[in-house]
């Protein structure tokens, strides 16, 4: 009784907070984009004229939206008549979904003669009572999926009220988040997900603690499937690389990829030492954020180092030479850079920032060096059936600090790598036991749609 009373009090104040917040959110620089849909207007109004939603998949932002697309790949032709609603909270997420929808429809028509499943795209509504009730009334979903880390109280409450099955897929939860939810888990009493697919045993335990009435099981991360598919494409692709024209054939290249601002000072000192010792090598720096391009160039110049922007190489039809330092100020080139570099450090990992996608380096045939702060990628280290993790397989080099990274990089020979294909083959063998759960889980969920 006490927990139910607390729950009612929570939802009263939670709803009131949304009422106060919505006028401010309407003026918010990021959230005013698609505001009509965020209050279940706009494109949501068209949902009433469509058949009920078979499957509603919610992805917070761009990263999760790619997971939505991975799930869509495993919709069988027996579900050609289903209606799928894909939502996201950000402009980036919606752009990923829009592009992915077009690719999905094209691929479906090339593969099957049956009509393509209807896919609707909308911004995810604010989790206030009025907006979410309206969204459920219009969509009438049979099955709902939350991806990764999201738990929305009104959304979950309405899943139960409307008898919509709720699954949490690729579920993750940090220790900090778990401790916070432990204190208020009574909020979710009676609104538990029907099944939770967690990407680590620890995540499974965390979710089971918060939702004791839910079925919680382990799954291999969806990203293993997407990485495996990308690896196959990379290995089958033509050898042409648009960046080759700016890479001198005999110059060793050290690549610092997705470097974050919090790592700059320490890496600046390392790059200065590397430049002084590695006289036959070039150094290429790819900042994670565009605002840091000019800052990197300025900081290096203040050290007395001569620096080029990558765009200058292309404009002047020049190649990287030994002793060059290049700040890469072009977008969309990182994959091709991995394929051409000889040594790589992947950033976001020397400070507690969670890490950046080091698996992508392996896809293009180069062993990544990282720091130890990789908490966003812990799922890549939890192996089943005695499989060794990437570090144990010598497919990842971990460094506790910048000093260790410097010692390693300074000791490496100035040689062009000839191992890209062999590394890809080793990575493919490592990935093979970890793939397949995306298809299996999608099949299990869609069984409930029949």
Language-model features: where?
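Donor-nucleotide binding loops and adjacent catalytic segments primarily
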Residues: 83-90, 94-97, 254, 262-333
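Short acidic alpha-helix that forms the nucleotide-activated donor recognition element
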Residues: 130-139, 315-323, 332-342, 363
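Short acidic active-site motifs
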Residues: 131, 155, 292, 329, ...
């Amino acid at each position: 009784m006490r927990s139910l009373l607390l729950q009612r009090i929570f939802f009263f104040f939670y709803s009131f907070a949304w009422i106060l917040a919505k006028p401010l959110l309407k003026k918010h620089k990021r959230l005013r984009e698609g505001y009509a849909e965020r209050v279940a207007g706009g494109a949501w109004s068209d949902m009433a004229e469509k058949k009920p939603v078979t499957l509603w998949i919610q992805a917070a932002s761009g990263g999760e939206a790619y997971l939505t697309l991975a799930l869509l790949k495993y919709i069988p032709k027996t579900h050609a008549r289903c209606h799928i609603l894909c939502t996201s909270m950000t402009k980036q997420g919606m752009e990923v979904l829009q592009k992915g929808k077009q690719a999905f429809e094209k691929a479906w028509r090339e593969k099957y003669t049956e009509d393509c499943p209807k896919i609707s795209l909308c911004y995810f509504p604010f989790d206030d009572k009025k907006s979410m009730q309206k969204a459920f009334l219009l969509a009438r979903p049979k099955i709902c999926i939350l991806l990764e880390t999201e738990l929305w109280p009104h959304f979950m409450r309405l899943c139960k009220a409307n008898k919509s099955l709720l699954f949490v897929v690729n579920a993750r939860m940090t220790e900090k988040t778990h401790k916070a939810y432990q204190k208020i888990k009574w909020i979710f009493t009676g609104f538990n997900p029907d099944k939770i697919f967690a990407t680590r045993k620890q995540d499974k335990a965390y979710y089971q603690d918060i939702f004791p009435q839910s079925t919680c099981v382990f799954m291999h991360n969806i990203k293993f499937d997407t990485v495996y598919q990308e690896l196959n494409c990379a290995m089958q692709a033509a050898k042409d690389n648009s960046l080759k024209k700016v890479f001198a054939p005999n110059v060793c290249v050290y690549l610092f990829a997705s470097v974050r601002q919090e790592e700059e000072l320490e890496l600046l000192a390392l790059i200065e030492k590397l430049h002084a010792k590695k006289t036959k090598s070039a150094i290429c720096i790819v900042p994670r954020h565009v605002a840091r391009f000019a800052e990197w160039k300025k900081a290096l110049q203040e050290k007395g180092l001569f620096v080029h922007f990558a765009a200058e190489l292309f404009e002047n039809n020049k190649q990287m030479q030994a002793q060059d330092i290049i700040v890469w100020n072009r977008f969309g080139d990182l994959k091709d850079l991995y394929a051409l570099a000889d040594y790589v450090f992947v950033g976001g990992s020397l400070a507690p920032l969670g890490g950046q996608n080091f698996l992508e380096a392996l896809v293009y045939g180069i062993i990544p060096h990282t720091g130890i702060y990789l908490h966003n990628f812990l799922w890549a280290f939890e192996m089943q059936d005695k499989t060794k993790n990437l570090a144990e397989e010598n497919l990842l080099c971990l460094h506790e600090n910048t000093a260790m990274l410097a010692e390693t990089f300074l000791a490496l020979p100035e040689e062009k790598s000839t191992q890209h294909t062999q590394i890809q083959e080793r990575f493919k063998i490592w990935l093979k036991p970890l793939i397949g759960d995306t298809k299996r889980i999608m099949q299990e969920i869609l069984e409930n749609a029949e």
